[in-house]
A protein has these predicted regions:
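Polar, low-complexity export/assembly segments characteristic of proteins
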Residues: 1-50, 62-173
């Protein structure tokens, strides 16, 4: 690389697959859902009649832990809000939710709903780079940045920094 390094430009930030919905005791009562991660791991969680949102969340958290799904869940009781998100960024990191109770969670009973994240987009030294989660990779045909990979964890867009390569070592600025 030149002494000043290669510029890193981010035009789109990566996102995690995320699902947010209204959730309270009325919705939780008698609720049954299936939750499937992109790699095929599947769990099913239900609450009996008279079950509460807190009870459902406890069952959901335990099922996710037992199945080692790569998902985070949270419940804001004051806001009546359920949030499920993938722990990793990117378009291939997602999950599917199916609700088996009329008109709640996904809107249609028995119809799976897919949630995907997005990959980072940008360029390295003005050359095209493909995104994979938080990784920008210079295209194989690039003159200066072929196959160069840079992980970006910031929240800014535009020119976000430079990377310098010297004798197969990297120095970040």
């Amino acid at each position: 690389s030149p002494v000043e390094g290669y510029s890193i430009e981010v035009t789109k930030l990566p996102k995690k697959a995320t699902f947010v919905t209204e959730f309270d005791d009325e919705i939780a009562e008698g609720l049954r859902i299936s939750l499937e991660e992109e790699d095929g791991n599947l769990i099913e969680v239900s609450t009996p009649e008279g079950g509460t949102a807190v009870n459902f969340m406890s069952r959901l958290e335990q099922a996710i832990k037992d199945a080692t799904l790569n998902l985070d869940v949270s419940y804001e009781k004051e806001e009546s809000q359920l949030k499920i998100s993938h722990k990793e960024f990117g378009q291939i990191k997602g999950f599917t939710i199916t609700s088996f109770k009329d008109d709640v969670i996904t809107g249609e009973q028995g119809v799976p709903k897919l949630f995907l994240g997005t990959d980072i987009e940008g360029s390295l030294e003005g050359e095209r780079a493909d995104g994979d989660g938080q990784i920008l990779k210079g295209n194989r045909d690039n003159f200066m940045t072929a196959d160069l990979r840079v992980a970006y964890i910031g929240e800014q867009m535009g020119e976000v920094g430079r990377v310098t390569l010297s004798q197969n070592a990297m120095q970040f600025q």
